[in-house]
Amino acid sequence: MDMEMALGLVKARLNRPPGDTALDAYFKKRIEGAAAKLKRIGIHLTESADDMMLLVDYTVWQYQNRDKAGDMPDWLRLDRRERWLAD
């Protein structure tokens, strides 16, 4: 998985300017953690655009909900489930 591409997409989803690198190391760890978690539940990510967007969406959701309890949105939960079934 292209980490720099994922980082750029995560920053875009969070409306952070591309030149703002203050949180890049943190976002990279978040992306790595999200990929590892997906792998633990049986999703083996490929280089496809669909897998990249699943990783980005999952990372952004985790980041935005890190301090509050809440269920995963249905669209993301179903996307993750469908990808898991495809493996």
Describe every region a protein language model picked out.
Residues 1-87:
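Divalent metal-cofactor coordination and adjacent catalytic microenvironments
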